[in-house]
């Protein structure tokens, strides 16, 4: 319904599907979590007449979002599902190695296909943005440690609220240099604005999440753990968790659900 409303009001960016919950570059996180929930429902035989259509819709809108990170995430999630399903039936090392190779090739094919459609995962605009962030964050010892300050390199909230004229998605000249409206990389965003201290905190947080999720893959919460793991590579090509708060909130809810389930 949200997607239909966006198109009805003309609030969209080119052909890419976006919603008020999140833009085309980040909404794939919500779709990926929903896909995981529907897969879990199918594995438990829960109302397939609902699960199958919803799963199909989520896959379609994810592709229509044009998110390269979303395609990679779904590919990784599907690969992990296939490996989990097959390891229960493949008993030889040779067979498992062949399966792993096949899954990796399929993921690579998905990346290549998306690159042919929309260009490479890393385009010139992102390179310029990351270079600007590097120069800004390495001007002196203080900025290396603490960054230039949250919201200074990329005042995205000002653009969203209309306080600043930052509606365009194109590269613009800023006080620090040429840059997109946001970093298109969560790691770069944290380092550029919060320095090594912020980056260390980010790595600790995600280190804990990865350890818990990897352990959970072997238990009953494996599908939820796989969706969380599959969402992490997108951090390198898009910015979320420190912006796009509705999408980030849903991701953190999923993470805390996994933590609670594992604690029990």
For every predicted segment, state its role.
Residues 16-33, 67-70, 183, 191-195, ...:
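Membrane-interface micro-motifs in multi-pass membrane enzymes
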Residues 193-231:
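Hydrophobic transmembrane alpha-helices and their immediate junctions
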Residues 4-21, 172-188:
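Juxtamembrane membrane-water interface segments that cap and precede transmembrane helices
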Residues 64-65, 78, 82-141, 150:
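A membrane-periplasm/extracellular boundary helix in multi-pass inner-membrane enzymes
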Residues 1-13, 19-87:
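Alpha-helical transmembrane segments of multi-pass inner-membrane proteins
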Residues 78, 224-264:
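Transmembrane alpha-helices of multi-pass inner-membrane enzymes
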Residues 121-124, 128, 144-194:
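Long extracytoplasmic/lumenal interhelical loops at the membrane interface
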């Amino acid at each position: 319904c949200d997607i239909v409303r966006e198109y009805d009001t003309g609030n969209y960016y080119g052909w890419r599907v976006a919603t008020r919950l999140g833009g085309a570059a980040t909404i794939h996180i919500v779709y990926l979590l929903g896909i995981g929930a529907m897969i879990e429902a199918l594995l438990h035989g829960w109302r397939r007449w609902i699960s199958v259509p919803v799963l199909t819709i989520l896959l379609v809108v994810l592709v229509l979002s044009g998110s390269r990170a979303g395609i990679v995430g779904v590919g990784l999630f599907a690969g992990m599902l296939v490996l989990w399903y097959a390891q229960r039936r493949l008993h030889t090392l040779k067979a498992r190695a062949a399966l792993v190779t096949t899954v990796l090739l399929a993921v690579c094919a998905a990346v290549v296909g998306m690159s042919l459609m929309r260009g490479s995962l890393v385009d010139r605009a992102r390179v310029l943005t990351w270079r600007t962030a590097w120069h800004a964050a390495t001007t002196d010892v203080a900025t290396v440690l603490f960054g230039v300050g949250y919201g200074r390199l990329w005042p995205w909230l000002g653009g969203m609220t209309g306080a600043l004229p930052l509606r365009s998605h194109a590269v613009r000249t800023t006080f620090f240099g040429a840059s997109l409206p946001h970093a298109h990389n969560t790691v770069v965003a944290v380092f550029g604005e919060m320095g090594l201290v912020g980056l260390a905190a980010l790595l600790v947080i995600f280190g804990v999440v990865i350890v818990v999720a990897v352990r959970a893959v072997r238990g009953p919460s494996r599908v939820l753990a796989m969706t969380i793991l599959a969402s992490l590579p997108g951090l390198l090509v898009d910015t979320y968790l420190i912006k796009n708060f509705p999408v980030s909130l849903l991701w953190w809810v999923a993470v805390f659900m996994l933590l609670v389930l594992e604690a029990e």
